[in-house]
Amino acid sequence: MKKFLRKPQFWLLTLGGFLSTSVILAACATPSNSALQTVFKARSSQFFNGEQGSLQSALTTALKNPVANKQFIAAPLLKALEAWYENNEDKKITQFLKDTKSNVDSQYTTAVDKVVSASRNKSLFVQQDLLDNAGGSEATWKAQKLLEQLISDFASRVFQKNYLNYKKDGQVSTGPFTYDELHKEESWKNFEFSAPRFSETNDDFFAKIQSQVFDQWVEYTDPTLISQVNYKYSAPSQGLGQIYNREKLKDKLTPSYAFPFFAEEKDIAPNQNVGNKRWKQLVKGEGAITDNNIGQSGTNSQKTGLLKYRNESNKGDFLDFPLNLSDTNETKQLVDASNIVDQLEAANLGAALNLKLQVFEQDNDELPQIKELKEDLNNTIVVDKSKDVEKASKTNALFYNDQEGKQQQSDSDPIAGALDDIFAQNTSEGTNLSKLAEQVKKAAATKMEAKTAVLRTNNSKGQQNNYVVLDAAIPTFNSTTSKSKNNSASNEVLVALKSGSINLRQVQQTDQNSYSPIKFRIVRNSTGVTVFGLDGGSYYLKQDSTNKKSVSKQSLTLLTKSSSGNSNKVLRDLDKQKQFLKFRAFQAKTNTFYSTNFAFSFPLNETLKSWFDKHRELILANALVNASLDQKDKASKALTEAFNPYKELIKEFAPVALATTMISFYFDQMKALNNKLLERARNLNQNVNQANPTPWLNGLSAKLPYVNTNGNYEKLNNYFTFLITKTLWPKVGQEETSISEESNKLKTKTADVDKIRDKILENIQTKVNDFVKNKLKPALAPRPAYSNVILLNVNNDKVLSSGANWSLASLLQSDKVNPLSFMLLKQAFDNNDLFKKAQKLFKDIQEKSSNNGGMQSSSTTNSDADALSKVIGNYYYTTWAKLTDKSIYGNPKDNKFDELFKLAFEASIDEKSFNVDYKAVIDHYRFIYTLQWLVDQKLKNFKSLLKTNLKFGEVAFIAYKNTETTNFSNPQGVFGSYFNYENSASEVKESTQTLDPNNFFYKTTTKPTVQAIQQVASLALVQKQQMQQNSTDHYGFTGLSTSTSSMFDASSRDAILQQITKTSLQQYGSKDQLKKIIQGTNNQLLLDRIAVQLSGLNPSTTNGGSGKTIATYFQVDAVGNPTLDFQAKRKLLLDLLDQYQNYFGNGAQKSQRDSTPSGTGNYLTYQNGSDKYTYTQFTYQDIDSLSLTTTSGTNNKIASDVVAALLLFQAADKGTQQLALSAINKPQLNIGDKRIESGLKLLK
């Protein structure tokens, strides 16, 4: 669309022009006049006039911000820390304080020196550039720098030692420690953070801080120990070429996730215990810690298989794997909710969260269940779904044959059958992997042409596709105990329990074929196969407050779900979780293991310090509120006395602030989780979607078995929702289960999670607003000389005032769009009458679009919103098109692109999220305002713009690019590939490389072609035929093109303009109109331009003209002078026009069709290589007939939805927006802080 009118920026974007004026300073002031011009003249004693600009509202906004809130606590913390350092008996610590203060003084001097200005202006620019954003004074600047250095040093001191100890009879024990004693649950109450028996100065204080940090870490992040064994891929003795196609794969063929293999036991050297050797021992349960081993009577000795490694005899729900059964030297990994996405690779991450959700009895993705673990790993990752597994489906197994799906048919798919190239021609191995190879070869030979990797459809020849590849699965146990047969090991012992009262001996009398899942996961990942479970995962669970009875250990540890009649909800028991983690951490600290074969690491101090460093101020504030410090210690007493005046305020605010920060963080982690799994898919798609696809290089790479809906792995994200609702929401409000739950389980749909978030944000707003209003009561503080910012006085307390001003400075950073500037601009829009109409118009558009599913077939449009709703997807698309990663919202369902684009659009303008894109929201406001301005009074302003910029006689056209393409569901693979590595609920059917996704998705509902017309048709008939074909969306719309602007390349644009010039004079209106122009002009250049165009046309020999030809116009005499003067030339043109009457009106349409055989109806075509353009000429005379309302029989040349599409393009034009906004009344913006003005400029 042509970029019409470049007017000056509208009033809201040039606030500096009338607000940044000088103020009259006191007589003693010395800065120059030019320097004084930088002093902001406040027009309000608030941040801006209006409720949201009040001092209270601004401070509330800062204190609920996850980044700015910690600054409020910083000032009281500094006072407490300074007292502790100053009164410490460790002279090194007191000296550090002195040195740091001296260092801060030097930093301040250096910072002042870096402020470049004349000496007389120094104080002015120091105030504005240095002090305004640090609380307003030299003292607050230095205090902020001092805190940064003190709290960093403090953290290094607190976590220098590990203070977790074991107490016997109230005394710290120095050992020796035994596993028999420590592993008993009754001993765990003796673990605590305390000073060692032979302590040093500050050890007791540091231990108490560590204890508080540990408690917060457990509560806010749900730490988890994953117990695991790993088995690495390895090549067979004769090389991978005996399974895979070495000739095709070449150097890519190495044991890996794409080309998995595990050497058979017979190929492993006798002196090595790796891979399949270890695996065989694992599935038999060898080397496990049993009750008999530790002198206990219990159930563990009665188990077999994997369950032997799960020890519950002491109620700890231990899961311990021997080191000698793993190919890696670690069998435990510590993760928590704050780092799990970063710590685990995608395959392990998905399985771990799936298992966590199973333990919490929340909805999770269904995984295949392995009935029996084979003794060969190759028969574990590839299984026969007809007998080896249950619940295998197309969403959780690669190469799944969907017997219920519709048969796909494709004779032209270039990649169909390509998986045949993965495997060698002859696979002699007898494993399931080789049987899968045979299956793929046979499928290719029988020409199964399903688009989704050969094996997705029914085989008309009866091909049985039983072998599937698993990426994650759940092992099961059988209800009976049987002997090991052939190459399999049984892991059956127990059945699903309805009640914890059933003892194990009774349980064994059950049906032979009953398989129940156990709480382990088997994962195929980048390095091999991992088997893991959660260590202690069910020990620290409890039922909710409606029933405090402990959850049955058997039902929680062994079974997937409680009985269907159980309405109790499972929550974490924080005390037990802390006890269990202390036990494991102390084991690692003291190397007190059952044996060295069960050793593991537990990096407690590193983990706690990492957690502390992320939220230092908030965590330390909570710690000081709750810690009972020794008042006999001089430093602790001084800290307490300094902190006490603020303790109650911080006790009320700090938990809310930390919870707010973590809630925001966990919502971000949902996005990070989505991105991690999608990034894995993107990497796999590269080999499929390139110009010359090589899908065989992906080998047996598969989609992970977690369903992606609209770009979200909703059920995996449910883990973070669980922590947010059950742990954090109660700190800022009260969970409303009517919003968060359904049938006693958390809702998982993204729309439902958004409602949970919205309610939490409401609670945070209420909580913080009440705190500010009732406890802080901010007032205006005196403004320092030359200052440009508002400073607050909180309770007449310098410390609290500094914290408040630091928090505001963090919120109002000059290089970022801030929420207060956004609120002011939003307020200005909301108070405008035309904007109110614009909001209603857009709401009507969305409602009509939703009611018709975005696919409107009716040709009648009764209102502006009717027509615009047909093409509103073009506006949504502009948001989606800007995304760097276009896969984050998933795939279109049934090619309904608008629904996908709308998701991206709505997310971008969401004003309720923790991370509002203020710029996107304001851009949307400008757009709908401008749209209303263009639409108002029957398109008055739109038509005026067109007439101003499209001159009479100028050639222009409306065009579509490749609109007739049928294979366009996934241009250039932007929606992934048909292998569906994303595991999207909406699968991509195909991929093509010929379309440009950058503008292809603009559309109209009117089809730009009609059936061929043999005779000159009336305009009404043409329009009627267009309407009859108005049945679906027609993509490739490129808007209005002129000689200076077009959405496609210049060569194609110029060729079409030239084609129009050679076939039409419609740009001049009618023949009579052109005659009037010729008769009335004295412009030689105009006459020459008309003559040149006539010379390119074929005149009619049957019309008038008395034998005259246009060639006469250009004749010259012997010396090169024109033989005709101006008057003669004008008369010649007038005489000749009758010969060209077929190039006007309907005659021009016939002429164009006749000269271009491919032209049909009102539209013509132009071919440029593989691109086909369908276009129709647009003239000055067409402007007045433009309308958004159309009824049957209307004779408008341009259909109403096409007009609507043009309007959307025009409303998005920045120049048009400036023109529209400059037309409204300019309200007086009364601002009291220059940072608000700076934020407005960033919203341009």
Swiss-Prot record:
Residues 1-27 form the signal peptide. Keywords: Cell membrane, Lipoprotein, Membrane, Palmitate, Signal. A lipid is attached at residue 28 (S-diacylglycerol cysteine). Pfam families: DUF3713. Belongs to the MG307/MG309/MG338 family. InterPro entries: DUF3713. A lipid is attached at residue 28 (N-palmitoyl cysteine). The keyword Disulfide bond does not apply. Its main location: membrane. It comes from Mycoplasma pneumoniae (strain ATCC 29342 / M129 / Subtype 1). GO terms for cellular component: plasma membrane. This is Uncharacterized lipoprotein MG307 homolog. It is found in: Cell membrane. The keyword Cell membrane applies. It is a lipid-anchor.
